[in-house]
């Protein structure tokens, strides 16, 4: 089914900030923007779920004419992306036919290359995981060996499925646009390696490369699941325990920081509803901000980085200290960027969720008390668990189909 996307003109849809199901963003009735309008409709079908949505509702939500919506949905049905989901009673007229997305009409692979482990997931158009593989990985074994092993795992995962492509997430720094790695902390041999081209050549599929933290943040931003400990799973904004009028969420323009603590420490930033990568994909190198000038030497060459202080504390088993250090860095981000929410993820956090949420939250609460500016910024555990980064990597391919994901 993937081959139909290019013919329909939605393969490369990048979207613009704030477009999406709940944003109230109008479509544009111009032939040149047919892909944009199709993405708006497709995203509404996605968020409507199995219950579906009528053509009239699609027109009302997008601002497109009923005729334009009918043409778009006819193409979507012809391409196998949408199908009828029954009929719904209406006021003062005949029942309306409702349409829904066909999740199995397309798939994407999300590949998380951690320093010592590989996770690969196959996701349908809704982002749901339909297959998964894990394997040990040595990121220091050399680029060619890693590419060969990763390609083998992806091929085994696909088992005959033809996906849109492969999203790859791994520690930075790197160039997202070119798919080229820089000096990954602890693995200088990766500097300058064109991972995107190497893996695409090996698999014969489109490949997108991003930092693990950016991928995880994207997965949260476009998803509808709620983080652990939140009040509701009904949607992105409400799922974080924030009031429905807060405007928080990818489409609503909210901002959050995703802090990933595992074999390293980094951040993914969503500012004004979009992933903030920076001009050179340099945003989010959170672990290497110095907070202790005479601190221990970090593998990056600096002293007193948050990463080395936090990982040293974890290694000693002093989780309260590790959480306090992480909280100090989170407080810096809150003060610098005025974000709405701090999300915590990564295997170290997953093993000690309560300790890290409590410890980071305590630092932010103390900051709020000192400044007298109201309630502290909330701290939550990010959704997705151990495969959150891999699921976010799949969204590097899926999100643009729905007019989302590009900052």
Features from the language model and the residues they span:
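Short glycine-aspartate micro-motif
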Residues: 108-112, 163-167, 256-260, 266-268, ...
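Glycine-rich phosphate-binding loop and adjoining helix at the ATP-binding site
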Residues: 129, 136-225, 249-255, 356-366
